[in-house]
Amino acid sequence: MRATGTLQVLCFLLSLARGSEMGNSQAVCPGTLNGLSVTGDADNQYQTLYKLYEKCEVVMGNLEIVLTGHNADLSFLQWIREVTGYVLVAMNEFSVLPLPNLRVVRGTQVYDGKFAIFVMLNYNTNSSHALRQLKFTQLTEILSGGVYIEKNDKLCHMDTIDWRDIVRVRGAEIVVKNNGANCPPCHEVCKGRCWGPGPDDCQILTKTICAPQCNGRCFGPNPNQCCHDECAGGCSGPQDTDCFACRRFNDSGACVPRCPEPLVYNKLTFQLEPNPHTKYQYGGVCVASCPHNFVVDQTFCVRACPPDKMEVDKHGLKMCEPCGGLCPKACEGTGSGSRYQTVDSSNIDGFVNCTKILGNLDFLITGLNVDPWHKIPALDPEKLNVFRTVREITGYLNIQSWPPHMHNFSVFSNLTTIGGRSLYNRGFSLLIMKNLNVTSLGFRSLKEISAGRVYISANQQLCYHHSLNWTRLLRGPSEERLDIKYDRPLGECLAEGKVCDPLCSSGGCWGPGPGQCLSCRNYSREGVCVTHCNFLQGEPREFVHEAQCFSCHPECLPMEGTSTCNGSGSDACARCAHFRDGPHCVNSCPHGILGAKGPIYKYPDAQNECRPCHENCTQGCNGPELQDCLGQAEVLMSKPHLVIAVTVGLAVILMILGGSFLYWRGRRIQNKRAMRRYLERGESIEPLDPSEKANKVLARIFKETELRKLKVLGSGVFGTVHKGIWIPEGESIKIPVCIKVIEDKSGRQSFQAVTDHMLAVGSLDHAHIVRLLGLCPGSSLQLVTQYLPLGSLLDHVKQHRETLGPQLLLNWGVQIAKGMYYLEEHSMVHRDLALRNVMLKSPSQVQVADFGVADLLPPDDKQLLHSEAKTPIKWMALESIHFGKYTHQSDVWSYGVTVWELMTFGAEPYAGLRLAEIPDLLEKGERLAQPQICTIDVYMVMVKCWMIDENIRPTFKELANEFTRMARDPPRYLVIKRASGPGTPPAAEPSVLTTKELQEAELEPELDLDLDLEAEEEGLATSLGSALSLPTGTLTRPRGSQSLLSPSSGYMPMNQSSLGEACLDSAVLGGREQFSRPISLHPIPRGRPASESSEGHVTGSEAELQEKVSVCRSRSRSRSPRPRGDSAYHSQRHSLLTPVTPLSPPGLEEEDGNGYVMPDTHLRGASSSREGTLSSVGLSSVLGTEEEDEDEEYEYMNRKRRGSPPRPPRPGSLEELGYEYMDVGSDLSASLGSTQSCPLHPMAIVPSAGTTPDEDYEYMNRRRGAGGAGGDYAAMGACPAAEQGYEEMRAFQGPGHHAPHVRYARLKTLRSLEATDSAFDNPDYWHSRLFPKANAQRT
């Protein structure tokens, strides 16, 4: 039985050891400090206990269980392992207190001043309910305090407990009496020591059974079974990590006497330096950082800083630091916006210890004297000294009354700044007036008056202020900021000797004496001017810095005849007063100071230099040898061999650990530097071959062994993208990269050789392209780029569409254009530009990826088939789809689709269409629909990217220009409407950039772009003159039922044939032309103000609506006319940059739903032939006029004059439908009637004086006045003249010249052409132009 009991105890101890190892993460809960006081009945007390201690392991405080009923279930207390204060159990009726895991009661707080456990009166005199058992089966340690258990009538076995084995303090009081009498005996395995009658209730002895060699607790009776000195409550082994609980602190499972200090002694620098492994004391645990609601005070986690310290944020750590005087305190001032109008006796106490006044300070007569109206007594003048702590006033200082016995304002002697954020009356920040007894100002520390004026007046005794150089105090211009008058005359002040001290400089002074100088002539000491510093004599010795005298360090020895120090530190002394430790003078040599490897001990030699003791000295020494150690000489001499062996072993271990640590840290630093060197382009990588040094290509050629693929990120038409790591040869670092594997699908070619194109791709380096780190040739080509964890821009806009704003979208458009322009400069065609191939380097910076990949493939692999699922047909230009022709202008087409994706937040282009249908739709003029957020300005930029003729598409340089211009005013071009409500998150919109920031950040210097758009607008306004006039009507909103087409497929027709059918006949009613409601191609959102369209903020539906109104006449005129010559209209005319194309005579062309003119090749009469070339989609131009003073009506894309004759009725059939010229107010002469038979010739464009020949774009509706021959657009006639090929045609009809007999040519729509005419391989298609060319040659 005895052996069985011993085995059970050992098993129990092992289970405790495992629990201690797993218990590093403890549930901590607060204790209470109520004593015997309770609130409510027994049920209420039980609920309070349950809320406090459910699943609690460590009670930070006291565990108080008082007045709990007999039916209370206290099983939730079983998890408590430690109580830092005391345990109080009183006046309860439950039978068992279940604390089976309680091991340690620390007793940091004791009950009644001396007891850590207090158990009393736990029974009910009127019933049999009482406490019968304390189940403290694992309690083995009470670190402080005694035990009191008395008057518990039914409580048993308390007298069997050996409390001396539990209580650590020898003299602690233990009172156990008057408890249960008729108790069952302990179980026989417990040997008379138990907490209850069962075999599991035995007391665990950890001190009285120990061998004499043990200083504390033990885990067995043998001498080698002693616990570590820092253990509490027992242990499972001799190490400090084997403790059941820690006596002082638990540092990551090890019991230590103190947590790692924040400062350690460095033997090399002889200084205390920050310890990188410091930890802080949080209760009984060492933590690397305090909880978020605690602050660090030295090495402790505290709830609040002590009064003489202030809380500061240092490197993200909240710490308590000494204030160095008075701790900062901000107080509310007086005056406007404050609760008080003046300083008075009712609020003077609120300024105690204030260092900063938030607002103003007013001293009025109602505040210093009795205020009978508000019943405020007079102010005690002595209380004005509370303002001696004030250093800053953010508002103004107004002193209009002052106590008679105070002759200056010395209570503000520490005031340094008057902010002037709020000013008094006429802009005064310092106002002093009508103080009859004041002789000097006394603002000896005032250095700055940030804003406002100075007013000093009617102070009859005031002197000294005449000498002040106010320009040193006033920030900014000081002219007219001083108003000083009606004070004591300067002559009287000089006669009485009220002048500045001779030690003051020419800057003047605030009053008499050397302490009132604005600046000193020689030196100053603590604000007082002096003739010299104590360099060679006087106490203390001083040194000078910026004309100020500072004391030497106290450990410096005063020298005679020479300087004592040259700085304030202990290392700046010429000689030391006591001892020198390295370069520093110290009061004593280090004795037990904690170093990186343990305590440091030193001794002073004959020259008072501190020398290190022998490494085996643990209590100091008198010399360098082992026998010079203090306190251990006899022990060490008695066991010399053992000491040497232990010393050598420890030294070797320390050397190994230290070397391992240094090696690990060095490798870590080396890896960081290597990664920076490999990833940053700034450091050129040395080529493998010296012959390559002349080649500036920075592409690295990888080996197969350097790259490891981790997972597949995606696949495309050119290959598969993997996430991987790059391990440079000879390095141990792992750099995350993206690896794109390109394989020859035919299997006939490998990528063993490194071509010039591969090196050219690797040499590209720009902020808005994904940089190629290198490539790995082989059977498949592997392109390695830096891994961008944010992913593609396509996924980003889909996920964050609710938070993206117009500024960010336009900025991204600029950056993509800049990246593509850089590729264009380096002759690199992308071929696969799409939003999925634009990566996010940061939320505000994008980079173009996957450029130049197609050129790495063999010719067979470059043939893209329509049937291939991954072929990017929807992003390709027509010439690329049909002929495999890839140029920078085909990339422009893809850029337009990419911008469309961006503006639709990642919508799929041509959704719902098969790939084989897309080329036919594009040939017919169909294009993607206008995104809802885009105004017509942005959409027209996209449309120009999708022109059939690649030569008239904009370049990336021009696209960067255009988007940069729009990025200056994002809400003008992108209108994003989101539902507002309490749950709607605000959009994370970046701030709008200024013009200078856009010039520096968005456009590179090499673009050489003209960013002075304001000057262009002014020039445009000047050239327009009075041509812009008020419209006679505005657009009306169509009803939803009027919509003809809702583009569900994500595209819109460029040539809407039904537009002509929707146009109704016009009639002249009452001399005024009436317009009907136009029919829209898209549903228009309701609730949108019509005025937005005139400000440049229109949706796609509204833009089409506005354009078609200029074609279709209606029967009603708008009620609210609005000028069209506003800023949005001019902005649109600037943004719609059109290619220079020939013009057609009036009556031969008609705009489609997007404002594009679709002329036929041949003019058609009654029997004209339709055979000929197709006309490509183009933009209409507007002819000039000589009559500038007439009223015209403008629309975005067209203009229409009031009073034009009615049109002939429209034909009913589509075949009979003709195109009608939009400017119907032409001067129709007799020659115009014959224009139907005249061939058309291209217009000659005469550049104006303000333009350059290489200007690629002109504005859409730019009006010219008389003398338009020298303008941007040349006038054109109906028929060519013999001498010049054309004659001038008047664009506007003169008064009284009507030609109602003129017939308009009927042209067939593009949609109705035969398949042979629209086939893409038809050469006529590619030789077509926006306007027919008479001398075009067929090829």
UniProtKB/Swiss-Prot annotation:
Residues 20-643 are extracellular. ATP binds at residues 713-721, 740, 786-788, 832-837. Residues 1185-1195 have a biased composition (Acidic residues). It is a single-pass type I membrane protein. Keywords: ATP-binding, Disulfide bond, Glycoprotein, Kinase, Membrane, Nucleotide-binding, Phosphoprotein, Receptor, Signal, Transferase, Transmembrane, Transmembrane helix, Tyrosine-protein kinase. Residues 663-1339 are cytoplasmic. The gene is Erbb3. GO terms for molecular function: ATP binding; ErbB-3 class receptor binding; growth factor binding; identical protein binding; neuregulin binding; neuregulin receptor activity; protein heterodimerization activity; protein tyrosine kinase activator activity. Residues 1039-1052 have a biased composition (Polar residues). It comes from Rattus norvegicus (Rat). It comes from the Eukaryota. The modification Phosphoserine is found at S684, S980. It catalyses: L-tyrosyl-[protein] + ATP = O-phospho-L-tyrosyl-[protein] + ADP + H(+). Residues 1-19 form the signal peptide. Residues 707-964 form the Protein kinase domain. Tyrosine-protein kinase that plays an essential role as cell surface receptor for neuregulins. Binds to neuregulin-1 (NRG1) and is activated by it; ligand-binding increases phosphorylation on tyrosine residues and promotes its association with the p85 subunit of phosphatidylinositol 3-kinase. May also be activated by CSPG5. Involved in the regulation of myeloid cell differentiation. Disulfide bonds join C186-C194, C190-C202, C210-C218, C214-C226, C227-C235, C231-C243, C246-C255, C259-C286, C290-C301, C305-C320, C323-C327, C500-C509, C504-C517, C520-C529, C533-C549, C552-C565, C556-C573, C576-C585, C589-C610, C613-C621, C617-C629. Residues 1023-1052, 1078-1215 are annotated as: Disordered. Its EC number is 2.7.10.1. The lineage of its organism: Eukaryota, Metazoa, Chordata, Craniata, Vertebrata. The keyword Cell cycle does not apply. Autophosphorylated. Ligand-binding increases phosphorylation on tyrosine residues and promotes its association with the p85 subunit of phosphatidylinositol 3-kinase. GO terms for biological process: axonogenesis; cell surface receptor protein tyrosine kinase signaling pathway; cellular response to insulin stimulus; cellular response to mechanical stimulus; circadian rhythm; cranial nerve development; endocardial cushion development; epidermal growth factor receptor signaling pathway. This is Receptor tyrosine-protein kinase erbB-3. It is an enzyme of class 2 (transferase). InterPro entries: Furin-like_Cys-rich_dom, Furin_repeat, GF_recep_IV, Growth_fac_rcpt_cys_sf, Kinase-like_dom_sf, Prot_kinase_dom, Rcpt_L-dom, Rcpt_L-dom_sf. Monomer and homodimer. Heterodimer with each of the other ERBB receptors (Potential). Interacts with CSPG5, PA2G4, GRB7, MYOC and MUC1. Found in a ternary complex with NRG1 and ITGAV:ITGB3 or ITGA6:ITGB4. GO terms for cellular component: apical plasma membrane; basal plasma membrane; basolateral plasma membrane; ERBB3:ERBB2 complex; extracellular space; lateral plasma membrane; neuronal cell body; plasma membrane. The keyword S-adenosyl-L-methionine does not apply.
